[in-house]
Amino acid sequence: MGKTLGVLSGVGHLPVDVVRGAKKAGYRTVAIALVPGTHEDLEKEADVFHAINIGKVGKIFKTLKQEGVDEVTMIGKVTKEILYSGGILVPDWQAIKILMSLPDRHDDTIMNALVAKLEDMGIHVMDQTLFLTDLMPQEGVLSKRQPTPEEWEDMKYGFAMAKKIGGLDIGQTVVVKNKAIMAVEAIEGTDACILRGGKLGKGAIVAKTAKPAQDNRFDMPGVGVKTMESMIESGCAGIVMEAGRTL
C-alpha cells in the first residue's frame, strides 16, 4: 500500500495542484481545509476530505493519525491576521499550549513549532514545492513588455529591500517607486500591501522574494491572479520575484 499524504490546505488552487501531483506519484491523499473558502475542487480531488478550523490543532493532529498519514504538506493562503481579527480562529487547548510556549508570534516561530509537533508524531513535513516545480518560473522577463531602465532600477532596489524584511521575518513583499519604499508587507498580507503602496506611487514596482533562510516546508512566496488584480487596481507597473523560489 502506498504512502498517505496529508494536505493542510489554505485558500487558492495550490492545494488542488498538490493533491493531483501527489496522486500521480502514487500517494493516497487526505486534504484538511483549515479556513473557509478553500477551492471547491479540493474535496472532489482528494481521496479523503475534512474541514477542520485551523485553531483546532488537537483535532487536526488526531485526524492525521486516524487517517494513517505518513507525510504532510502545508499549502495555500492562510493570512496570519486570523490570529487577531477574531471570528475565524477558535483555538483549542493544544493550540493555546503551543502559542503560549512561543517567545514571539513571528511566522517562522509558529510554523517551526507546528513542524516540530508533527515530526514528534512521526509525520514527516514535506517540501511545499515537491509537486509544484512546474509553477516555479526561472530567470527572465515573463511579460510581453520589457521593464524601462527606471523600472529595472526599482526592481533591483525592491528585491534587495524585500530580502532584508524577509530576514527580519516581517514579510516577503515591498512596493517601491523611484528607489523609495511605498509599502512593506506585514500581517495584512501581500494584496493589502500592494493596494496601499500602489496608490501612494502610481507606476510602482512590487518585489516579492523568499526569505534569506527560507524553509521550503512552509510559507514559500506565491504570486497569483489575485496578486495581478491588486497590482492593476492600484496602478503598479510591474513585479519582480525570485527565480526558482516563487510559486
Would you name each region that the model predicts?
Residues K3-L34:
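N-terminal basic/disordered segments at the start of proteins
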Residues D17-V18, D41, L83-S85:
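Short glycine-/acidic-enriched loop or helix-start segments at secondary-structure transitions
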Residues L34-K62, Q66-E67, G87-L99, D191-L247:
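Feature captures the catalytic cores and cofactor-binding loops of soluble hydro-lyases/lyases
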Residues V57-F131:
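N-terminal glycine-rich phosphate/adenylate-binding segment common to multiple enzyme folds
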